[in-house]
């Protein structure tokens, strides 16, 4: 689940409620770097509104930053057939001039609910970042109109006086550190060249599995089927599930019905 800043706070696998591989106290940050300034979603410059999509088990977040002149819309869902968390990300340049907007995703895992023994590394063959510990594997990837993610790094956090790899994004460039062991984290960057008031959409996902091979197979599945198709099919599935019975709500208000 995500919090009020659209940060993923809980990832349960292999069961709902067991095990939590973020623990609720670490962060999967989202931020934007524009014109030499980085604002994570926790920054006071952001105005963030989150909701559920109507008749769908999917989250929708609109984040607006007047200081940066950027708007970001996130549509979040878990694919209904496989263990894949999907994010459809639409970025709008609200400025009157063309700019490069960089979107960063930071990942702090506590795999097996233990702050030791984890590994994070960049897989150059599949162009993905993988976090793993034993039979718990988290493959992170994404795709935009010009290919995969543009930048990456791995590191360690909350140990040896290091805050975490999210600090590496502050200058708008990542160190491309290939691998780390221990309490490891990572950052992915997507770089968008946007004309004045232009919007572009890209996709980001986390495939969760019990082996690296299985995670790579899930990643190949997303690329083959296209992430946009998976987002739409998941929305359609839940819409059909919610509406398979014709309920009589006996005059309840629309807001009350939507809670149901």
Predicted segments with their positions:
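An extended acidic
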Residues: 1-66, 133, 138-167, 232-258
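Solvent-exposed loop and beta-edge segments used for protein-protein assembly and interaction
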Residues: 22, 53-55, 66, 79-83, ...
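Short Pro-Gly-centered flexible turn/kink motifs
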Residues: 50, 99-101, 192-211
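Generic recognition of stable, solvent-exposed alpha-helical segments in well-folded globular domains
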Residues: 183-185, 189, 199, 255-259
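Short acidic, Pro/Gly- and aromatic-enriched capping/linker segments at domain boundaries
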Residues: 174-194
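Predominantly extracellular/luminal cell-surface or secreted proteins
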Residues: 33-35, 104-108, 205-209
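Short alpha-helical segments and helix-capping/turn motifs at coil-helix boundaries
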Residues: 13-17, 45-46, 85-88, 186-193
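Polysaccharide-binding surfaces and accessory modules of carbohydrate-active proteins
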Residues: 49, 62-64, 68-173, 186-188, ...
């Amino acid at each position: 689940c995500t919090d009020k800043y659209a940060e993923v706070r809980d990832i349960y696998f292999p069961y709902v409620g067991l095990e939590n591989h973020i623990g609720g106290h670490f962060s999967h940050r989202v931020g934007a770097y524009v014109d030499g300034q980085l604002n994570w979603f926790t920054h006071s410059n952001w105005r963030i509104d989150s909701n559920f999509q109507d008749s769908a088990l999917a989250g929708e977040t609109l984040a607006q930053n007047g200081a940066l002149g950027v708007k970001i819309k996130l549509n979040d869902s878990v694919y209904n057939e496989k263990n894949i968390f999907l994010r459809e990300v639409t970025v709008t340049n609200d400025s009157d001039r063309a700019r490069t907007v960089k979107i960063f995703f930071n990942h702090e895992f506590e795999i097996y609910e233990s702050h030791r023994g984890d590994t994070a590394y960049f897989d150059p063959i599949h162009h993905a970042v993988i976090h793993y510990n034993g039979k718990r594997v988290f493959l992170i990837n994404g795709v935009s109109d010009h290919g995969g993610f543009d930048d990456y790094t791995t590191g360690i956090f909350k140990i040896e006086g290091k805050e975490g790899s999210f600090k590496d994004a502050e200058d708008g460039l990542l160190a491309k550190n290939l691998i780390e062991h221990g309490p490891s984290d990572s950052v992915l960057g997507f770089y968008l060249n946007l004309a004045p008031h232009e919007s572009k959409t890209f996709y980001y996902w986390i495939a969760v599995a019990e082996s690296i091979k299985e995670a790579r197979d899930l990643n190949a599945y997303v690329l083959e089927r296209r992430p946009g198709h998976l987002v739409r099919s998941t929305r359609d599935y839940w819409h059909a599930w919610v509406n398979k019975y014709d309920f009589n709500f006996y005059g309840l208000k629309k807001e009350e019905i939507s809670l149901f």
